[in-house]
Structure formats: structure tokens, C-alpha cells
Amino acid sequence: MPVRQLPETIVNRIAAGEVVERPASVVKELVENAIDAGACRVDVFSDGGGRRKIVIADDGGGMTQADLALAVDRHATSKLDDEDLLAIRTLGFRGEALPSIGAVARLSLTTRHAAEPHAWTLSVEGGAKSPISPAALSQGTRVEVADLFFATPARLKFLKTDRTEAEAIREVVRRLAMARPDIAFTLAGEERAPVTWAAALPGAPGRLTRLGDILGADFRANAIEVGSEREGVAVEGFAASPSLTRANALGQYLFVNGRPVRDKLILGAVRAAYADYLPRDRHPVVALFVTLDSREVDANVHPAKTEVRFRNAGLVRALIVHALKEGLAREGRRTAANSAGAAISNFRPASMPPGNWDWRSSPSYPVGGGSSAAPSFGERPQAAFDVGGPSADIRPHEAAPELLDRPLGAARTQIHETYIVSQTRDGLIVVDQHAAHERIVYERLKASLDANGVQRQILLIPDIVEMDEATVERLVARAEELSKFGLVVESFGPGAVAVRETPSLLGKVNAASLLRDLAEHMAEWDEALPLERRLMHVAATMACHGSVRAGRVLKPEEMNALLREMEATPNSGQCNHGRPTYVELTLADIEKLFGRR
């Protein structure tokens, strides 16, 4: 077959295949046009998942009759000058949306410019334009798209159900509404009640209002404001506390110069910032806005304009990580307290069992007098915590007056040999002793690694740990990384490892259990995992093994010492796996449980 020039209608339909993938693509392009036109309000309607009908109406600047005639021609745009391709300041810029939509659907445009005496309307059906005629419209532009893909019926079979396509439209509008809280949006159709997001006030409060309206009250209650700026690049937005997570990354909303994007660089930076707070199977919820000179970012790298390329990607990543880490560290104590709200809703009034209860047969520690199986308060604690602080040797009744004003209060008791209950001026706090100490040890290991290295203790008799040859090879291959944390191992034949030194911070540790856990984690590591992340995984595993275990009875001075160390430790609100280390119940919360409020 000889080479020949394709007809214009076929060319437009091929081009439309890149721009118009599904109904949500149409909505995205048309709403972006409305935003670029200076609209203060955008109304979106869809029916049949967008296949049967899509209507976008705005109160923007509109178009003149002459502009309307050009608007449906390919590569005709008012948003780009000859030299502006590397300095794009609008959401749209290629001039492909309207002609692409008109090539595969029945398109109707009605618009009115302030300089025109009345509105004008134009129709395009399968690429064929109708003459422009007068119309009635008070302001802005109204675009109707009907029978999407009627001109390319083969595309219809690749669409999902109406419900799925409608949800994709909803997600597109949500993202654009988050990007522009100063614009009012209405989403209607699909046999659902209309949703309206009113225009918000400028600045962070208005942005949080819009994000809360879209992402829900949970996000608003757990939102932490973050921000960082350097060398002309600014990162701002809101990140949810580690107590609010999702099973996937769909709750991460990223915007560059007001454009919603899905950028692997930014997603990786978010994951890195939360690495010390979340388990690997949970994902944070964030809304981040990156602002920089338009010449420092290329938005023309994807047909749907959902990806960007940064000139200085390293700077952008560093700013995002810094902003998130700083915000999470600043609000660390508050994030743990938020976990109590959900627990309160699960409380139910208790009922006594039938019959008479003999309190004398109850196996509890006496309040005063008598004997007890608990350790004597006068004994010195074991070396699990640093008890050299001023509160270490203070009896509970003596410590209360001054310790009640401390953030984590004064220890009152231990329940189930696992949880510490402390009293504050305004309520009580329940601490998971293992999770809390695990975070303390983890932060100490990191600090030692950043300073002069982790101090080691030499074993007089090396521990010989037997395991399969593959596991031995895996551990020996990472011996240099393990030694950075004071764990010195070497091969001891084909099926064993000799442990010669262990970290001093861990005290007496079960080397066999620690090595097996480390080997299991190493088996899951991707070879591309950065060294820093591998080291943090090692530190987290060591911290878990070096922490006080659930089931150990603690003395009052040990409990108070742990509380004081938590107050002095960054990120102490969560353990290394992302779970809260403590929950706080205010006096008001307690009164609610008993119907006093």
C-alpha cells in the first residue's frame, strides 16, 4: 500500500485517542478550560457514566464569535505564545481538547464574552462543524458533550461500567476542586444528590476547609500543616497524622503549580518521610502543593498532562521530605492522642454478673497494707530505662504534685503487665510499654549511628546461631551494614553464624531470635532499596528486640522513667510499626462515658 496523507477527520480521531481516554478525560479537559478562563464557579453534570451526556458550565470570561470559530480547530489556543512552551502558566496549553472531543462525540459550545452583545453557539459532530449562530447565555461558557465515542464505537467496549466511569469523573472533579479552593464547584447527575463545594477563603485555613469538605472530617481532625521553602521552590499543604492511614496510595493528592499530578518522585518522597511512622502495608493521606517557577518544571511530558518533570528533582524531593518530617515531629504527641476518640465510641456500660461478688477473693494488688507479689517499690529498677532523672526515686504519692503537669503525667499503676496508666491534670493516659520503649530504643540507635556509631559489647563467648545456608549467606552479605549498629556477625561453617558483638543499647538480647527476624526482613528487601532505608529497617528490628516486653512487671520508678524518656524522645507518639504508643482520655472524655456530659 502506498504512503498517503490521512483525512483530517481520521487524524483528529487518532489525536483524540491520546487526549480522550474515557469520560473522565473529557471532564478534566473542560474543567481545566473553565479554570483557565477565570471562572469563579464551575458546574459539572454527567449521565450514564459520562457516555450519554456531560455538561460543564462556568462563569468565566467566555469567548468572542471569532475565538469560538477557532476554538474547535486543532492546536488553536489563547494560552500559549510562540516562546512560552517552557514557561507554561495555565492548565491547558495545547489546543487539542475541544477538537479531540468534537472528533469522537456530539459537541455543543455556547459562550458569551463581555464585549459581545449576546452569546454564540457552535456544534461539532464527529469532526463536522456547524455554522455559528446567536444564543442565549448570561455569562461564561457552557459545553455539552453527548454520545461520547459514537464516531469510534470500538472505544466503547473498553469503558468500564457506568458506576465506575462516574466515580472516575467524581475523582477528577475532587482533585481540581482541591487545587482551587477559591472556586466553587458543583457535581450533579448519575441519579445522585448534587454535591457543592463553596468557594473558600484564601490561605491555609481556606485550603483546609476545602480539603476537609472533600476528604472528610477524619482528615480535618488529623491534619498537620506542613511547609518548606528554598531556592524558589515552596512546598505546603496538609498531612494526616500516622493514626489515619489507608491500604493504598490513593489518598495522596499532589499538585504542582496548581496542576493535579501523579509523580513517582513526589510519591517516593512522601513514603520516605513517613517511613519511621507507618508499617510497610499502610499508606499516608496527604495533600501537598508544590509551587515553583514554571521554567523549572516541564508539564508537556504526557498527553493527559498528569506527569511533570523537574529541572532540580533532588531539591523538590528534599523539601517534601523535610516539610513532612518537621510537621510530623512537631505534632507527634498530638497524633497519638487522636487515637482515643475512636476507642471512646466503642465503650459500653458494664453490667455486673449475677450473684454476690466477694472482693476479698479478687487477685489484685492491695492499695495499702498487706503483702503483694509485686516487686518492692524501694528496690532499684533493672537497666531497662534511664532512671537517673529527678523522678526516678520519687514515690507515686510524692511525685504526683509536680509530675501531674508533665505532658504524660505521673504513673499510677500497670495493668496486665503491659499497659501503664498515668494521671495528668486533665485526665489519664494509657501507655503501651513495649511500643513506647521500642520507639525510644529506635531513636537512640539512629542518633548513635549519626554520631560516633553504636557502642558495642563484646561477648566473652560468641553466640553460635544455626540456620540454613541461604540465610547464613544473606546475613554475612549484610555484615558490614549490621556492624554499623554494633552487631558483629561472621560465618561459622556452612550452616551457622557466630555473633561476637551486640549493641550495648539492647542489653542482654536473644541473638538467635534477632538474627532470624533480621534475615526474614532482608529476604524481602529489593536490591534497589537505598542503604539508608536498609539501615533503618535494621534499626527498627533491633529496637523491637531490645525493648521491654509486654508481660514484665514494672516498678513505679521505672514507669515514671519511661514516661520522662518518652517526653524527651522525638516521634514518641508512634512505635516503629506506626501504631500509637499511648492514648489520652481527657476528664471530659471520661465524664462522657459516665453520662455526665
Swiss-Prot record:
CDD domains: HATPase_MutL-MLH-PMS-like, MutL_Trans. Pfam families: DNA_mis_repair, HATPase_c_3, MutL_C. Belongs to the DNA mismatch repair MutL/HexB family. GO terms for cellular component: mismatch repair complex. GO terms for biological process: mismatch repair. The lineage of its organism: Bacteria, Pseudomonadati, Pseudomonadota, Alphaproteobacteria, Hyphomicrobiales. This is DNA mismatch repair protein MutL. PANTHER family: DNA MISMATCH REPAIR PROTEIN MLH, PMS, MUTL, DNA MISMATCH REPAIR PROTEIN MLH1. One of its GO terms (molecular function) is mismatched DNA binding. It comes from Rhodopseudomonas palustris (strain BisB5). This protein is involved in the repair of mismatches in DNA. It is required for dam-dependent methyl-directed DNA mismatch repair. May act as a 'molecular matchmaker', a protein that promotes the formation of a stable complex between two or more DNA-binding proteins in an ATP-dependent manner without itself being part of a final effector complex. HAMAP family: DNA_mis_repair. Keywords: DNA damage, DNA repair.
